[in-house]
């Protein structure tokens, strides 16, 4: 009864200072760019960059060097979460979100404008790595700020629904990235694509950045942060406070995100690689056919994100996430061999649709759950840090571990790996308290 009364009192005090539509667009635009960038960079790192930015000789070495630049962003992201989290918790959410979007956007456009190895030699891969590091820094501060923008401007009883707005950017970005590559494959020859066509998606992201900046600049500061600022309760070093006074919830938040990241990268990067690789290594399906399957399956992802937010508001974050994580474990144990391993396009699509729909369900509540674990004075840093450390543990290595397990132990071992990661998330959830009724 105490928690309910607190919630109702808080709701009576709630007065929106930013329109719902502005909050929606401003919070999802950054994650849309993030996932758009993820997929276009991952694709270009395999297909284009080894030929453009690295000396020609050993093609395998060039591909590995190119993929290493992809991994740089995962190292940069926790650094970005600490840097942008520091200013987000001390200066304000609005200014920091503008800065993170600018950092991410400028770095992405720069990649699309970089000259190749044939033009500037060794400076080409160095500048590519630097731009990728800049992307990672911006990304490190993006999601946490977007989640706070949504949840700190939300009516208390709709906090998880509002908190799902940033997660909607993921399927939107992924859908447009896939669509862009399909469109380019229809309109351009291979020679045109390798010459200049690959640059189009990177430069096009500038449009999204401009829209995002326009909306974010017009927002008012979060009312929750303004209370802390007026009371002068900001801490001097948010990361230091986080790692000394809030270690337990930081670790729990990281492991709560683990299954989400592992599931997404297995369903997208690994499944794409396995489905298109020639037999006996993979299924040998046409690349464009798999891209279409992923685009259609991502619709299920997008639909489930707000559904998950509604469920988390109705039944609580912890309870709904425990059920969803259990479903991920069952999917991991029983779906890989019969569906993905069948090689039948209909069953492969069913696998992708099921997995990405579960991704929407597990990702949807995160925008409320992670921020609610932390007090206002370290919330930006805490939510961002947990989210981005989980990206190293669950995202950066997942496709490689999955490929190694499949090669050495078969497809079922990939499912066991996903089930194990989801099991760690389930334990973290069981050790976490319910946060639905608490005030921010």
From Swiss-Prot:
Record flagged with keyword Transport: yes
Q: Provide the disulphide bond pattern.
A: none
Q: Where is this chain primarily localised?
A: membrane
Q: Which residues form the signal peptide?
A: none
Q: Where is the protein localized? A: Cell inner membrane
Periplasmic side of membrane: 56-66, 189-192, 270-289, 342-345, 406-410
The entry assigns this protein to a family as follows:
Belongs to the major facilitator superfamily. Metabolite:H+ Symporter (MHS) family (TC 2.A.1.6) family.
Report the PANTHER family cross-referenced here: INNER MEMBRANE METABOLITE TRANSPORT PROTEIN YHJE, SHIKIMATE TRANSPORTER
Q: Which NCBIfam families match?
A: 2A0106 (TIGR00883)
Name of the protein this chain belongs to: Inner membrane metabolite transport protein YhjE
The organism is Escherichia coli (strain K12)
Q: Which gene encodes it?
A: yhjE
């Amino acid at each position: 009864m105490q928690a309910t009364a607190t919630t109702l009192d808080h709701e009576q005090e709630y007065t929106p200072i930013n329109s719902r539509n502005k909050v929606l667009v401003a919070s999802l635009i950054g994650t849309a760019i993030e996932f758009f960038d993820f997929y276009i960079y991952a694709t270009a790192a395999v297909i284009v960059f080894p030929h453009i930015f690295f000396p020609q000789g050993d093609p395998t070495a060039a591909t590995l060097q190119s993929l290493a630049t992809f991994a740089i962003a995962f190292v940069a992201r926790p650094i970005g979460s600490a840097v942008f989290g520091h200013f987000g918790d001390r200066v304000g959410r609005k200014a920091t979100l503008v800065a993170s979007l600018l950092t991410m956007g400028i770095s992405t456009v720069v990649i699309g404008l970089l000259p190749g190895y044939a033009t500037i030699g060794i400076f080409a891969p160095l500048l590519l790595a630097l731009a990728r590091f800049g992307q990672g820094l911006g990304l490190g501060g993006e999601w946490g700020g977007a989640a706070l923008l949504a949840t700190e401007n939300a009516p208390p009883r709709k906090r998880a629904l509002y908190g799902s707005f940033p997660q909607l950017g993921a399927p939107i970005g992924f859908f447009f990235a896939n669509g862009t590559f399909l469109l380019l494959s229809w309109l351009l020859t291979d020679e045109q694509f390798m010459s200049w066509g690959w640059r189009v998606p990177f430069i096009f992201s500038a449009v999204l950045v401009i829209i995002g900046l326009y909306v974010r600049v017009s927002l008012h500061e979060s009312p929750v942060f303004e209370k802390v600022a007026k009371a002068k309760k900001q801490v001097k070093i948010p990361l230091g406070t986080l790692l000394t006074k809030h270690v337990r919830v930081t670790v729990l938040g990281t492991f709560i995100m683990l299954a989400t990241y592992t599931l997404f990268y297995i369903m997208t990067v690994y499944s794409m690689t396995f489905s298109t690789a020639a037999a006996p290594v993979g299924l040998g399906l046409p690349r464009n056919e798999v891209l279409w399957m992923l685009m259609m399956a991502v619709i299920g992802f997008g639909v489930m994100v707000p559904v998950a937010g509604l469920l988390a508001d109705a039944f609580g974050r912890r309870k709904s996430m425990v059920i969803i994580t259990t479903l991920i474990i069952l999917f991991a144990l029983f779906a890989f061999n019969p569906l993905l391993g069948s090689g039948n396009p209909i069953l492969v699509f069913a696998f992708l649709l099921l997995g990405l729909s579960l991704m929407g369900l597990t990702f949807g509540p995160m925008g409320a759950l992670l921020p609610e674990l932390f007090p206002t004075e370290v919330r930006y840093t805490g939510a961002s840090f947990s989210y981005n450390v989980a990206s190293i543990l669950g995202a950066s290595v997942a496709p490689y571990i999955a490929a190694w397990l499949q090669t050495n132990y078969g497809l079922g071992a990939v499912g066991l790996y996903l089930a194990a990661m989801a099991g760690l998330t389930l334990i973290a959830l069981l050790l976490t308290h319910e946060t639905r009724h608490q005030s921010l």
